Amino acid sequence: MNNNIINLIAAIILSLSIIFGWQYFVVKPEQKKQQQQIAVQKAENLKKQQLKALVEPATDIVVQEESGVQRIKIESESLTGSISLKGLRFDDLILKKYKQDLSNNSPEVRLFSPANTENAYFAEIGLVSNLSSVKLPNNDTIWNSDSEILSPEKPVNLFWVNEDGVKFLVTITVDENYLFTIEQTIVNNSDKELPIQSYGLINRKYTAVEKAVNILHQGPIGCIDENLKEYSYDDIKDKKSEKFAASKVDWIGITDKYWLSSLIPDKSSNYSSNFNYALKQGTERYQVDFISPVQIIKPGENFSIKSRIFAGAKKVDLLDKYEKQYDIKLFDRAIDFGWFYIITKPVFYAMNFFYGYVGNFGVSILIVTVIIKLLMFTLANKSYRSMKKMKNLQPEIDRIKNLYSDDKARLNQEIMALYKKEKVNPVAGCLPILVQIPLFFSIYKVLYVTIEMRQVPFYGWIKDLSAPDPTTIFNLFGLLPFSPPSFLMIGAWPILMAITMFLQQKMSPEPADPMQAQVMKFMPLIFLFMFSSFPVGLLIYWSWNNILSIIQQYYINKFN
């Protein structure tokens, strides 16, 4: 085999080894649950066109009713929680359909928490003015409500009147999923003009306890001027603030691996928006916010503006639905499908499609793998034939090398002439590898970032396709009463992957270069340890893909 081809294949293998070795040995695949505390915010001291980023924390907001302050209970198929009538803040939200782990007594996932709790995190929609004389609702305002429960069937109407007779009305609705709609109306019954600005903010206390996972974005995110803006927590911490003046803001928010909190402002105007960080009283606070231009409301006039808050699980079909229904640009990109988005999302659609028929994502992975294999059959067939031809030409290539060992230019010329004469493409054997690399990463991404794959079982001992195989050969798959260290957690599926990889190599033509042949023999063992911590769904794909390749190679050997 030509040295250039050997180098190319070796480079591909080395690149994969470096990428996944780094992931395994340096970057842990999951961030631990982060401890969060957050600040309560005030919005009265805003300058024109700019929302104050971070404010001092309050100490009087808890989930329970206090000092006579009631809460509006949120109750839907997907959500439970409450909204405080003091300050009208979304600071108590639980996702009913998701558990924190697979244990029987696992609590449900909590997204929002009040400001004086350990995991504080909340959203807020309100009004501000650049004139201090204008009396607006603030964090101490006690709103009046016509209902104690907010549900998809029953919106909540709130009102508050200031000392000048100006009436502030808020209507809150929630759908069956995770979208709140907040319509604010100002009725100017005073004899003065009111300069009003609408704002929204999401504030979170976040302290990283582990190094971030580089293959996944977590932190401030948004679509501004139809461009996706992503900033890690470290980015914002270093910059302190990232500002966007007078921009088209489709949505901004804070994303986790599976969960998203997002502000979706009214599309009637442009907005100034900010991604901010501050360290106050020993706590790290992150905030995303937007503020509208000044709207002058004349005496006797009304003004209404509608904003939305998404707070929930990043389900692909749900984000797609909202994106189309409300024209929210790039809303599906809150799911980090990565560089191969154009491949990864169709792969997910295919898996989800077959899941609708078979009811098991593991089986769906098997079906999609078969389809991919069929689509690539012709290419793989040509590749295998080319590899066999290259092996048959190796004696002649060795003769040419000996003949022109002192003349590299002539050597390459003669070898290329031989390829042309025998109609051999020297890179054909590499094409399936190059094509499968983005497919491999796409399937990995689907398993790693989509909520649909979280805590879903296969068969037998596999209860979560997005987690590593929980068994290990070092305690005889649970027969021995001890737990090996994590680097020895080599389960049945990693072993099956390595065995099928070894068998596939045995059926393939060996590399002509003895050194490369020796290296290839160790690859199944290297990959066994390297991939043991990867999602078991990926190992199911790889093992099944190897089995199909073995069948394909048997077919080619027999009939060609």
Curated annotation (Swiss-Prot):
Keyword Cell membrane listed: yes
TM annotation in the entry: 5-25, 334-354, 357-377, 431-451, 476-496, 522-542
Keywords per UniProt: Cell inner membrane, Cell membrane, Chaperone, Membrane, Protein transport, Transmembrane, Transmembrane helix, Transport
Signal peptide: none
Membrane topology: Multi-pass membrane protein
GO cellular component terms given for this protein: plasma membrane
Family matches, as Pfam families: 60KD_IMP (PF02096), YidC_periplas (PF14849)
Molecular function as annotated in GO: membrane insertase activity
Subcellular localization, as worded in the UniProt entry: Cell inner membrane
The keyword Transmembrane is annotated on this UniProt entry: yes
A single BP term in Gene Ontology: protein transport
Coiled coil: none
Subunit composition and interactions: Interacts with the Sec translocase complex via SecD. Specifically interacts with transmembrane segments of nascent integral membrane proteins during membrane integration.
Sequence similarity: Belongs to the OXA1/ALB3/YidC family. Type 1 subfamily.
Function: Required for the insertion and/or proper folding and/or complex formation of integral membrane proteins into the membrane. Involved in integration of membrane proteins that insert both dependently and independently of the Sec translocase complex, as well as at least some lipoproteins. Aids folding of multispanning membrane proteins.
Protein's name according to its UniProt entry: Membrane protein insertase YidC
